From Swiss-Prot:
This is Catalase-peroxidase. SUPFAM superfamilies: Heme-dependent peroxidases (SSF48113). Belongs to the peroxidase family. Peroxidase/catalase subfamily. It comes from the Eukaryota.
Amino acid sequence: MSKGECPMRTANVAGGGTKIKDWWPNELPVSVLRQHDPRQNPLTSDFNYAEEFKKLDYNALKKDLTALMTDSQDWWPADFGHYGGLFVRMAWHSAGTYRVTDGRGGGGDGQQRFAPLNAWPDNVSLDKARRLLWPIKQKYGNKISWADLMLLTGNVALESMGCETFGFAGGRPDTFQSDESIYWGGEDTWLGNDVRYSNGNKGVSGEGVVDGDQHKMDHKDIHSRDLEQPVAAAHMGLIYVNPEGPDGVPDPIAAARDIRTTFHRMAMNDEETAALIIGGHSFGKTHGAAPSENTGPDPNSEDLSTQGFGWINKHGSGKGPDTITSGLEVTWTGTPTKWSNKYLEYLYKYEWELEKSPAGANQWVAKTEDHIIPDAYDANKKHKPRMLTTDMSMRMDPGFEKITRRWLDHPQELHDAFIRAWFKLLHRDMGPRSRWVGPEIPKEVLLWEDPVPEVDHALVEESDISALKKQILEAGIEPSKLIRTAWASAASYRGSDKRGGANGARIRLAPQKDWEVNNPKELAEVLKALEGVQSKFNGSASGGKKISLADLIVLAGTAAVEKAAGVSVPFTPGRTDATEEQTDAKSFEHLEPATDPFRNYGKSSDRARTEQLDLDKASLLRLTAPELTVLVGGMRALNANWDSSSHGIFTKRPGQLTNDFFVNLLDINTEWKAADSSKLPELYEGFDRKSGQKKWTGTRHDLVYGSHPELRAIAEVYAQPDNSDKFVKDFVKAWDKVMSNDRFDLKAKSS
């Protein structure tokens, strides 16, 4: 059967046909909470990647990667006889999808292998880069993940071209499916930005779309638009910005605006941004030998016979000098396989004028007769210097110009800035150092790592823990407040980039101490009481034992849950307290939740309903649908609403860990009606069907568990009397999971 002959919609097997999403486009996608099912992983459940990595002959692997750089293959020959530029781009485009807003993207899961990233126009030809690596991946097997290998290869590529790097940490276990929790944008055409910008443009339809195709479209204002959150790319299918300029318009000043927006959302400042662009563009070349009409479909749209390759090129040989990747044809320096300062030397030495690439894309050529740029395949050919519109931004934008002129005269400063920014690019989503493995971890600890101090004292033992629980409960603080505080501390965790969590006790620092959801006045009261308990214990404990406030906050919540449930709740000490100097307060602002379903906080935005935001929060906490459900029900029973309101507290015995929330929500004798939306937005009232008496009030956070079929099915399990003990057991297990999400020092495997 030929490609395109049998669309999935018409297939009558294997999940084909009209789907639930086709009938109900707004259906809550609970399936995103099933993504991390271990059954999707072909490796055994006890596989420990961090331990496997430690068995790796790291130096031998790097030696093999270095040899690969100059082992040009006939089926995909290396530019200038060196694959360095290709592999730098592969690593950059793997890590560069990270965005600080929600911590998603990045290279930590090796997602470049899967849709949609493997088919993005910005990733044309990276299918070949990964295939070149397969023999090495096959050789070293489970000791090196694809996620680590793609990034390490970029590091080795730099080193092989004379650019000393800052270091490298392994420890990224592979995933084996596309991450469908990520919002990459709402556009339905490649290079489109008509959703992410209110005045954006439709993209390009058809097969074989490449970066340099947007100049073919009509354009709107590119100077004053605002990029929607949480995306960090100016176009669908690009990592950052359009190399031709915004929407294909070759305007370096407007391009600088887009560059700042996208790189800042990747947690890079202006200096780091400039260093990455200059450093990355010091190597290799772009490819635009002919118009994109010569290229075939992306890998996901191709025939089985191509075996994962896409963008088959009909121009000439389809490779080497005939390659079409971006549609632009630029080699930045005269030393494309060697680190140098020639990028900046050329940028400022020459004046530049617009030209069209052989593919018709906008690019810049030096106003000179100097032919000093080597040809990638013909040693007898030389070319004029050329640049991209985004390169022109490094000179023409006043802010970037100030930075880059300094580096022109001080190249060592550029090198230091580049290798630090490159290291940050590759490791920003790795989380704490307790996840890092390998012999090249730098000794210098960087602020963006969100460091916490090492444990430098003896930890509390069981007898101490019991005594501390007693002191906490006798300190005069309501148990519900202790539970809310512990939850607030731990639930800041993001499984996407492994930031946040209880370790560090940053809930006592700005900005977390001032977040509305954390009820600052109540939080200050609880922290003051716990600091008193801490001071008393640390001042009198024997054997050098101490307890951190981070541990005490979690222990306080644990003690309160135990009191409410009458069961034992796990607790493992070992957290430490971060200082203000170890905390980038501005960076932590991105962790503030839009909603918290567990504390009944927040409401719909103009783009997402409350329950969709709740699902996103649960996904970041790496919860399953049953865990989400049992935690919400338990927190309501424990009277843990952020503002102490009664909404969703469907029980006559608040403060006891019961399944009353589910029993009363699903009571068939209760009729729910929306309250007056002008006074009480997103509030619902539950009335007795016979008497008409109002019994309860609830929010969308609450009622979704009776409305959504899958969530209701789970809620019904917990509403049954024969599952009341199961409810308590499951709540305690899920509670402990959230409290320990960031305890990578305890986990059997890094995940």
